[in-house]
From Swiss-Prot:
It comes from the Bacteria. GO terms for biological process: fatty acid biosynthetic process. The lineage of its organism: Bacteria, Pseudomonadati, Pseudomonadota, Alphaproteobacteria, Hyphomicrobiales. This is Holo-[acyl-carrier-protein] synthase. The gene is acpS. Gene3D superfamilies: 4'-phosphopantetheinyl transferase domain (3.90.470.20). SUPFAM superfamilies: 4'-phosphopantetheinyl transferase (SSF56214). GO terms for molecular function: holo-[acyl-carrier-protein] synthase activity; magnesium ion binding.
Amino acid sequence: MIIGIGSDLIDITRIAKVIERHGERFLDRIFTETERARAGRRDKQPNLVAATYAKRFAAKEACSKALGTGIRQGVWWRDMGVVNLPGGRPTMALTGGAKARLDALTPAGMIAQIDLSITDEWPLAQAFVVISAIPATAS
């Protein structure tokens, strides 16, 4: 059962300009340590760094839309982070207000599954999030 769907499209150059202007203050406010570490591995190529951050920014926007809140009502930027599953597939890890909202949306006896697709083609980055409720399996 689909709980929510969200999408976002962003101009990578916009994120690059914000990083150039606000630097660490912006990065600390928006991105998790995991996301910053991933972008840091691309530090020799500024366009890749900006694209990495832009995709994650778009993913947070898309996830907040799928949660039905946007970035408000207790759902904040660092409550949502892009992580990779063991096979490399991206998903969202939620904490704080975002996790509380997800828990409130998930019906009893179900668990939430977040599917994420992120891509970029200069100068755009795009993200789609589908949040589904799937039956909990007996342990």
